[in-house]
C-alpha cells in the first residue's frame, strides 16, 4: 500500500444511520462524486432503511463528508466512530444500492422506530456483569474468533442472515432475562434488538457505538473486552484506544489470524491457514502460492498489490 505522509495520518470513519430514505437511489452518484473529489476511499451502502459504511481520507475530507451526509434529509444524528490508520486501508471508493444496509433478510423490521435501549460504553460493564443478563455477540464467528466480551455467547453464525434462526432456536433461554447485544460499530446489534423486540421481548439492550466506541472510551485496565476487534479493512483488527492490532488476514480464505495461528505449520502467507488448510487441494495451494509470489514481486518493485480487497 502507498504510505501516507507522516504529517497527514489517514482518518477512518465507520458510520451508519437507520432512517427512511424514499429516494435513496438518487443519492448514489452525488455521494460518489463528493468522495472521489476529496480522495476519500471505502464503501457506502444506501437502502430504504438508511446508510452504512466505512470510509477513509484526510481529516478535513472526512469532516466534510460527515457534514454533507448529515445535511441529507433524515440523516442528521449519524452514528460515527473515528479511528486512524498509518496507510490508506481501502483501494477505491464504492457507493452501492442495497435492499438492506445490513442484511438480516427479515421483512418489516424497523430499527429507526423499534430498536432496543442504547447503553453507553461507560455503563456497559455494569449491565453485562449483572446476574441473569445474557450477553450476545451478533457478529460472525470468524470475527468472534479473535476477540469478544468476557462471558459473551457466540451464536456461531457465518452471516447475519443466520441470526434470526439462532434466536428462534434459543428463545427459551432468553425468556425473563435482560438481553444485551453488541457488534463492531453498533449497526448489526441495533437491528438485532429490533428483531428480538418484535418477538415480544422487552428488556433488550445494545452497546451504543459498538465495540469500537467501547475500545475508544473505556480504559484497558477497566475493560471486559478480551482480544482484538476485527475490522473490515486492511488494518484487520484494532485494540484498546483503537490502535492497530496484531491480527493478520489469511489471503486464501480471508479469515483473521491471531499471533499463535501465524506460527502454525498449516500457515503459509497467501496460501493457507489452520482455518482453510483442510478445505484446499494441492492444486489450490499451488495456485495461491503463485499468486503470493506475484504479490511479493509487485511489492519488491514498489507497486501496490491488489488481490480483490
From Swiss-Prot:
Residues in Rhodanese domain copies: 129-223
Q: Which of the seven top EC classes does this enzyme belong to? A: oxidoreductase
Which keywords does this chain's UniProt record carry?
Oxidoreductase, tRNA processing
- What EC numbers are recorded for this enzyme? 1.14.-.-
Name the residues annotated as catalytic in the UniProt entry: 183
Q: Any signal peptide, and if so, which residues?
A: none
The GO biological-process annotations, alphabetized, read as: tRNA modification
Any Pfam family the entry gives: UPF0176_N
NCBIfam families for the chain: PRK00142.1-4
Protein name listed in UniProt = tRNA uridine(34) hydroxylase
Organism, scientific name: Mesorhizobium japonicum (strain LMG 29417 / CECT 9101 / MAFF 303099) (Mesorhizobium loti (strain MAFF 303099))
Give the taxonomic lineage as stored in the record: Bacteria, Pseudomonadati, Pseudomonadota, Alphaproteobacteria, Hyphomicrobiales
